[in-house]
Amino acid sequence: MEEPLGSPPAALSALEKNVAELTVMDVYDIASLVGHEFERVIDQHGCEAIARLMPKVVRVLEILEVLVSRHHVAPELDELRLELDRLRVERMDRIEKERKHQKELELVEDVWRGEAQDLLSQIAQLQEENKQLMTNLNHKDVGFSEEELQKHEGMSERERQVMKRLKEVVDKQRDEIRAKDRELVLKNEDVEALQQQQTRLMKINHDLRHRVTVVEAQGKALIEQKVELEADLQTKEQEMGSLRAELGKLRERLQGEHSQNGEEEEAEIPPQPDGEESISDAEKAALDLKDPNRPRFTLQELRDVLHERNELKSKVFLLQEELAYYKSEEIEEENRIPQPPPITHPRTSPQPESGIKRLFSFFSRDKRRLANTQRPTHIHESFGQWAITHRDDGYTEQGQEALQHL
């Protein structure tokens, strides 16, 4: 069985690929191959043979396109969700550790306060005893013996040692409290740094989602543009084939008219070489339709306009996303709530017209044009007028298609 004319070899390689490796471009190649097969069946058996089958095939290809696009987007979204969950778990762990550390500091402070209170009470008691001893010493009139003096000096020395030991304990606890305060300050700085890092990672996550959305939109626009250009190219090739067929018919009719008229036409019509030159000029005028860079609206200009339109659309989309991002930042700064923003799931926008339907609509339009061009036409004007008229019609039709694309 012969391969259909103009079918891309990429469609055959797409059919041989693994299911997990399919992309949206492979789905479009498969759709193109199926469309060519439908076209050949229509040529052989008519449109009624596949009138009920074609909508079902189109629906199956659309479902395949959606599944393939979801398969390529889902892993990246899962990775981002896992990263966000991990950051949240880390933040909760840090908060829990900070609470435990705060409780430990409070316990240490309570113990220190209790010990300091005990020491202060002991100091007050010793001072009171010292005062009592001093008063007793002043009121006594009898002299102390040497043994009593040594005993009193021993008691005062012991009190000094107790006071010195108490002072050392207080200084040691004060140093420990200062060290704990410094450690608490360092922990707070670490917590603030981790919060800043979390905020930065959340911004990076938001930017990555934004870039993924922009790249998906640009990819879809490029795929649709490729499908439209391929369909336009096939349409132009079919139009050129029909024009060549009509040109051959006109040549045969002109030769028949020349042979029937005979000598009368030889007197009225210029010599044969000039006729051949006029026919060649008409052929050149008709064949000029093949030139992609012919005047008025060329295919290259159409591509430039479509490319510029897609760039402007992507720039507008980027500006809208940046404006929404800055507005959300201003709202967050006004509210000043230190909590991570909730996960925003993008709303499911209404499904645009699938590239599969657009591709099959081009095939049906090509069929209608071929059916219209194959009908017999009656020519009442000369060959030059016919060529000029069809050239203007071609320019008009090309301009209308360009306006539709724009």
From Swiss-Prot:
Entry-annotated residues carrying Phosphoserine: 7, 259
GO molecular function: dynein light intermediate chain binding; protein dimerization activity; small GTPase binding
Sections of the chain in a coiled coil: 76-258
Gene3D superfamilies to which the protein is assigned, alphabetical: 1.20.58.1770, 6.10.230.10
The UniProt record lists the keyword Phosphoprotein: yes
Residue ranges of every copy of the RH1 domain listed in the record: 10-97
Sequence ranges of Acidic residues compositional bias: 262-280
Any GO BP: protein transport from ciliary membrane to plasma membrane
Ranges for domain RH2: 294-359
InterPro entries noted in UniProt: DZIP_RILPL, RH1, RH2, RILP_dimer
Location of region: Disordered: 255-280, 330-354
Tissues and organs where the protein is expressed, per its UniProt entry: Highly expressed in heart, skeletal muscle, brain and lung (at protein level).
Keywords, in A-Z order: Cell projection, Cilium, Coiled coil, Cytoplasm, Cytoskeleton, Phosphoprotein, Protein transport, S-nitrosylation, Transport
Residues bearing PTM S-nitrosocysteine: 47
Maturation and modification: S-nitrosylation is required for the interaction with GAPDH.
Subcellular location: Cytoplasm, Cytosol; Cytoplasm, Cytoskeleton, Microtubule organizing center, Centrosome, Centriole; Cytoplasm, Cytoskeleton, Cilium basal body
Any single Gene Ontology cellular-component annotation: cilium
Function: Plays a role in the regulation of cell shape and polarity. Plays a role in cellular protein transport, including protein transport away from primary cilia. Neuroprotective protein, which acts by sequestring GAPDH in the cytosol and prevent the apoptotic function of GAPDH in the nucleus. Competes with SIAH1 for binding GAPDH. Does not regulate lysosomal morphology and distribution. Binds to RAB10 following LRRK2-mediated RAB10 phosphorylation which leads to inhibition of ciliogenesis.
Assembly and interaction partners: Interacts (when S-nitrosylated) with GAPDH. Interacts with RAB8A; interaction is dependent on the phosphorylation of 'Thr-72' of RAB8A. Interacts with RAB10 and RAB12; the interaction is dependent on the phosphorylation of 'Thr-73' of RAB10, and 'Ser-105' of RAB12.
Family from the record: Belongs to the RILPL family.
Protein name as annotated: RILP-like protein 1
Species, as recorded: Rattus norvegicus
